[in-house]
Design a protein with these regions (language model features):
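Non-catalytic, conformational "gating/processing" segments within enzyme and secreted inhibitor domains
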Residues: 131, 138, 188, 192-224
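Bacterial peptidoglycan biogenesis and beta-lactam-recognition machinery
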Residues: 69-73, 125, 213-215, 225-231
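Short, intrinsically disordered, charge-balanced linker/junction segments flanking boundaries
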Residues: 275-284
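Non-catalytic beta-strand/loop surface segments
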Residues: 2-50, 74-110, 148-203, 227-273
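Active-site SXXK
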Residues: 58-72
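M16/insulysin-pitrilysin zinc metalloprotease superfamily fold
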Residues: 70-71, 105-137
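Acidic/histidine-enriched alpha-helical segments
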Residues: 125-145, 213, 232-248
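Short pre-active-site segment immediately N-terminal to the catalytic Zn-binding motif
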Residues: 48-58
Length: 284
């Protein structure tokens, strides 16, 4: 049975109460009741993002986010979308430097469906992953890069700024979208190895918030996720340390056919978790 503890908001604060649990396979589960509306939200957060990618395989975390919607052993094709939307829910996924997450918002009585769907693809997506899915989503992601970065005014500005702010070899040197060359180079076996390493219960946090019965919800989580094996092969991410001061101004001028001039600037702020960082957050 899962073990857990409760974190309670201070009396009179108006805050919510959350309980945290951990399954035997390492999956962390956070539950929070909010009965204002008959809706429940599920978010499955995997501790893998673009900072965990290796040189020559940038964009793999984001590509795999797309592959997660291509069908699993029991829910083929677009079945995940169709089942959630057919039940009156909504869904999506996002990828960042640090993490990848998947989420559904469902009518309360359809919560079990969302939990089963997330557990199904965590546990059985590998069996359905094939070359057709890989090529399909590779093209989708490459087209997304063209639409959002390569073929729009100022589209590559943030990508250039990131590469300038973080030196070669730093895990933040590239953005989650990845390069065209690396997207072309990614193989089906790369995707399978990525899944085996990172899409494991001991590398994830499942949160369920809304009009829920915590005891019943936890029972469903144990029922659907409890038998998925953990995986201990994940390598630690590359060192993300940087000196406190850059020591110089780093500048790049780009000349392109765009409607007007634009300036994008970034500043090195104090380390996260310090009083100075908190002050900077308030100031900015």
């Amino acid at each position: 049975m899962p073990m857990g503890h409760t974190a309670t908001a201070q009396a009179g604060s108006g805050g919510l109460t959350a309980t945290e649990h951990r399954l035997a396979n390492g999956l962390r589960v956070v539950l929070s009741e909010d009965h204002l509306t008959p809706v429940a939200a599920v978010c499955l957060w995997y501790d893998v993002g673009s900072r965990h990618e290796v040189k020559g395989r940038t964009g793999l975390a984001h590509l795999f986010e797309h592959l997660m919607f291509q069908g699993s052993a029991q829910v083929t094709g677009n079945g995940h979308f169709e089942l959630v939307q057919g039940a009156g829910g909504s869904l999506n996924g996002t990828t960042s430097f640090e993490r990848t997450n998947y989420f559904e918002t469902m009518p309360t009585h359809q919560l079990e469906l969302a939990l089963w769907l997330e557990a199904d693809r965590m546990g059985s997506l590998l069996a359905a992953l094939d070359e057709e899915s890989m090529e399909n989503q590779r093209d989708v992601v490459k087209n997304e890069r063209r639409q959002r970065y390569d073929n729009v005014p100022y589209g590559t500005a943030f990508e250039r700024l990131t590469a300038l702010a973080y030196p070669e070899g730093h895990p933040y040197h590239h953005t989650p979208i990845g390069s065209m060359a690396d997207l072309d180079a990614a193989t089906l076996e790369d995707a399978r190895a990525f899944f085996r390493t990172n899409y494991a219960p001991n590398n994830a946090v499942l949160s369920v918030v809304g009009d829920i019965d915590p005891e019943q919800t936890l029972a469903w989580v144990e029922k659907y996720f409890g038998s998925i094996p953990s995986h201990d092969g994940k390598q630690p991410p590359r060192d993300g340390g940087l000196p406190d001061i850059i020591g110089e101004e780093l500048r790049e001028e780009v000349h392109e056919e765009v409607p007007a001039r634009a300036l994008m600037a970034a500043y090195r702020l104090p380390h996260d978790g310090t009083r100075e960082c908190d002050a900077a957050d308030l100031a900015l």
